[in-house]
Amino acid sequence: MRRLTAFGLALLLLASGVARGEPAVTLDPQQSQVFRAWFVRIAQEQLRQGPSPRWHQQDCAGLVRFAANEALKVHDGKWLRANGLSNRYLPPELALSPEQRRLAQNWQQGGGQVGPYVNAIKLVQFNSRLVGRDLNQARPGDLMFYDQGDDQHLMIWMGRSIAYHTGSSTPTDNGMRSVSLQQLMTWKDTRWIPDESNPNFIGIYRLAFLSQ
């Protein structure tokens, strides 16, 4: 990917957001709330159990795609067993139309194309809307987007912590990370501090199919 300044990338994302408009299929406010609960729970399970063998393309954007796709599925006994979960302390089940269940298989890829794969920048450019750069505006399941020049990175705001995948893994490190906001705000590498004064922190994004 060609190198962009953070300011240039922000302008590009803003312009694409204006051109994109609202998705044809969305979740209503109640569905959006339940989706967030499942999305966060599935991301938490990747931290607790390690990445699911059903999760392909394990990186920061892959975590978002996987959690969104699994959140939109029917969470029956077969699904629970496949994901190592019991039926205790789960969010309520999502009542969705067939079109809504396919939302995370039909990401906007640009140029009128849709499909199950998008990278980090296309997740925010074509499939999310900017909320702002103040973390007080973030809701659980919102995305924190960073531009580091040659690379772009996503983290998930979990409500009380932040989850992400580093983009690489080894036999002794599955790449999953969870940090508190306090930890991130005092990070030695200041490029990752989610503060309005940090030009590498582009902002908080919300999946476009969520109505709130």
Swiss-Prot record:
* Keywords, in A-Z order: Signal
Q: Name one Pfam family in it.
A: DUF1175
Which residues does UniProt assign to the signal peptide?
1-21
Keyword hit for Nuclease: no
Signal recorded as keyword? yes
Protein family per UniProt: To E.coli YfaT and T.maritima TM0986.
Q: Protein name, please?
A: Uncharacterized protein PA4490
State the organism named in the record: Pseudomonas aeruginosa (strain ATCC 15692 / DSM 22644 / CIP 104116 / JCM 14847 / LMG 12228 / 1C / PRS 101 / PAO1)
Taxonomic lineage is: Bacteria, Pseudomonadati, Pseudomonadota, Gammaproteobacteria, Pseudomonadales
